[in-house]
Amino acid sequence: MTDVPSPFDPKAFVRSLTQRPGVYRMVDGRGEVLYVGKARNLKKRVASYFTRSRKSARIELMLTQVQDIQVTVTHTEAEALILENTLIKELRPRYNVLLRDDKSYPWIYLSSHQDFPRLSFHRGARKGPGRWFGPFPSGHAVRETLNTLQKVFRIRQCQDSFFSNRSRPCLQHQIKRCTAPCVGYISREAYQEDVRHAVLFLEGRSNQVIEELGARMEAASERLEFEAAAQYRDRIQALQAVQERQYIVGEKGDLDVIACVSDGVTACVTVFFFRQGRNLGNKVFYPRIPEGADEAEVLAAFLARYYIGRKAPPELVISHTIPEQKVLGEALSRESGHRVRVTHSVRKERRRWLEMALTNARHALTARTSTQAMALHRLEALQDALQLPALPERIECFDISHTRGEATVAACVVFNQDGPLKSDYRRFNIRGITPGDDYAAMRQALSRRYQRLKKGEGVLPDILLIDGGKGQVAQAEAVLEELQVDDVYLVGIAKGPERRPGEETLILSDEDGREKTLGPDAPALQLLQQVRDEAHRFAIAGHRQQRGKARTRSALEDIPGLGPKRRQALLRHFGGLKAVARAGVEDLARTPGISRALAQKVYDHYHGDSG
């Protein structure tokens, strides 16, 4: 006899609740969490859902599905806010405001464990010794700053393995972007002084650097060292040019300016990053919002989702007054290790920055709405062209990339009704096939992808698009049949005889195996081309990455008995791999730590076993 669950009685449940702070989870009959919320008083907050007061349409709809409520009691409201954010990120409930893009922001990293520190791009957890500068709104902003640092201060950015094996300066020294510390062209003291100036620049103290360089320029001129004086002059001019381009005239300090606009269906949040008065740029988000959510509600949810779990600056300037603004500040202060002030009422410079953020958010939302309208038009055209019973909600496209069979990579890109869904993109490193066999590569990639989906790990597409002709489509048909994947419409897109855009042929997987051509200006074809081209781009990027890894791997790593220290000794002794490959046994054996037997192994590896 099976147990029949008791019907949920909200009144009885509310009577059992505590008045302490905590987090509540609304759960449906299947055990799926519909909504996560936090409360200063759990009893009052949960009870408010079941009063006769008027509620938004989305809350009314959600309550018709609630079969259980789970609660977690916390010590403080700030602690509840942090837990709420953690659960929303983990469970992604459908009635909460969710961030689509939660990728970590990039930073500039300055190592501190070497005599000649290195500057580099970093994204991810910040661990290990050294200093971190940022965050920056994009990888482009980091690379632009690194490029400026390299031009002005000539700090090395090469990998440690490259640095430790140089016998002569590299190209960066020749183009005056590095002082070649690898071969002793600059003293440790002089290099550290350049590093100190670079740090001052990253901290927003360029004026101090300019003053110091100006004093050195004058001193060099007095000593009649005109070449050195000219170098200082060039650095000063480069820094002044950067100041003109990046600095905001007015207040200093670290803060983010966050603005939210919504049309009731789509919301846009833009975040501007200011560090030491310098505008580092902005990032735009389009959070998924429940129907009827207002701008203040969206902004409050965004701030919690985005900032809890990452270090916030001391000040957040926001476009709307939000509920429990003080509690959010307390939670962020705890997370960040310093006081975080969340404010809406600002004047002067900050008011201008906030207006700028709002203007950008409005423009971005308008552009997004226009793009969505075009995407919907193309989807409707595709539905009509393929005679589909419903509008396709998800399209997946596969492509293969390799160089004469080397480093074969298959790529899968995903589009939904909003465009590319990059969080669902996947790459597959293809192994165990005959090099260059595209059919086998496609078969392997599709099998790996849809075996997972059959296990419930993901969502099946409405349309599976294959970049290829009848042969590739046949491979896809075989895989889908073998895995018993139904209700997926298979389409191949084959290039025309001249491989010109607009001349593609569609290979359809219906009973007749029809071929179909659309006009070059047909919206349906333009959509398929966009998806196909994105798969092509994603596949090529993955292939180049794999090929680069394989080709930069030292051939010495394949020689038994030749560990990292001995490999390094060989490279130092000969100055590079090419010289090692050309060396004879006797020359190899003269390297410190290399026996004659090991030298013979190295020689045989490059020249073949003569025995």
Swiss-Prot record:
Q: Record's Gene Ontology CC terms? A: cytoplasm; excinuclease repair complex
Q: What PROSITE patterns does its record include?
A: GIY_YIG, UVR, UVRC
Show the InterPro entries listed in the entry: GIY-YIG_endonuc (IPR000305), GIY-YIG_endonuc_sf (IPR035901), GIY-YIG_UvrC_Cho (IPR047296), Hlx-hairpin-Hlx_DNA-bd_motif (IPR003583), RuvA_2-like (IPR010994), UVR_dom (IPR001943), UVR_dom_sf (IPR036876), UvrABC_protein_C (IPR050066)
* Gene that this sequence comes from: uvrC
NCBIfam families hit by this protein: PRK00558.1-5, uvrC
Its name, as the record gives it, is UvrABC system protein C
Source taxonomy: Bacteria, Pseudomonadati, Pseudomonadota, Gammaproteobacteria, Chromatiales
Domain (GIY-YIG) spans 19-97
DNA damage found in the keyword field: yes
Which family does the entry's similarity section mention?
A: Belongs to the UvrC family.
Q: Where in the cell is it found?
A: Cytoplasm
Description of how the protein assembles with itself and partners: Interacts with UvrB in an incision complex.
Q: Which Gene Ontology molecular-function terms are recorded? A: DNA binding; excinuclease ABC activity
Query: Which key words tag this protein in UniProt?
Result: Cytoplasm, DNA damage, DNA excision, DNA repair, Excision nuclease, SOS response
Q: Which GO terms describe its biological process?
A: nucleotide-excision repair; SOS response
Instruction: Read off the SMART domains from this record.
Output: GIYc, HhH1
Q: What does this protein do?
A: The UvrABC repair system catalyzes the recognition and processing of DNA lesions. UvrC both incises the 5' and 3' sides of the lesion. The N-terminal half is responsible for the 3' incision and the C-terminal half is responsible for the 5' incision.
Q: Which residues form the UVR domain?
A: 207-242
| PANTHER family xrefs | UVRABC SYSTEM PROTEIN C (PTHR30562:SF1), UVRC/OXIDOREDUCTASE (PTHR30562)
Q: Name the Pfam families on file.
A: GIY-YIG, HHH_5, UVR, UvrC_RNaseH, UvrC_RNaseH_dom
